[in-house]
């Protein structure tokens, strides 16, 4: 399972790298079972890789024909999200224009990365997967993960992504209720 996520994100990273015109580095994927509140605690304390207190989340819900469902999340520190959008739109884009387009640009980045991952996983498992439109939310870690009971056990596949030239990092999380 870890290798499947690693392969799927490798393809998505190439697309993201082309968008921001910068090399993207990936961490080794971690796949584990954890309670939802424990994941929130780790993200808040920075144990999951030094993530800031406020994050921007790009979320899409996916379902297979046989009823399997997952939420795929792309998380970036809130302060880094504007830099990602600036890299996407180009160096000469005004700060005012970037702020106006931030939500749409983040949704598009999430759409590209998450759908590329899910498409690769669907191909790998020989399954058809349908997904929702991406939703962008910037908030505290606790609020980003409060959509289900905190004690719910979930399967988490976490892969870190970083843009070393700009000291930005984020995570792709696949959350599956078990």
PLM feature spans:
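Composition-driven recognition of glycine/serine/threonine/acidic- and proline-rich low-complexity segments
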Residues: 1-178
């Amino acid at each position: 399972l870890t290798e499947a996520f690693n392969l799927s994100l490798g393809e998505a990273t190439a697309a993201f790298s082309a968008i921001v015109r910068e090399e993207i580095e990936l961490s080794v994927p971690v796949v584990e079972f954890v309670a939802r509140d424990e994941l929130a605690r780790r993200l808040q304390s920075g144990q999951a890789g030094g993530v800031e207190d406020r994050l921007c989340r790009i979320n899409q819900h996916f379902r297979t024909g046989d009823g399997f469902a997952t939420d795929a999340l792309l998380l970036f520190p809130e302060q880094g999200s504007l830099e990602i959008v600036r890299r996407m739109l180009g160096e000469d884009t005004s700060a005012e224009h970037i702020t106006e387009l931030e939500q749409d640009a983040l949704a598009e980045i999430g759409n590209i990365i998450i759908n590329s991952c899910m498409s690769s996983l669907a191909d790998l498992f020989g399954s058809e997967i349908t997904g929702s439109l991406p939703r962008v939310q910037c908030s505290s870690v606790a609020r980003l993960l409060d959509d289900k009971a905190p004690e719910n056990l979930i399967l988490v596949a976490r892969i870190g992504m970083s843009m070393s030239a700009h000291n930005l990092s984020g995570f792709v999380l696949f959350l599956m209720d078990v």
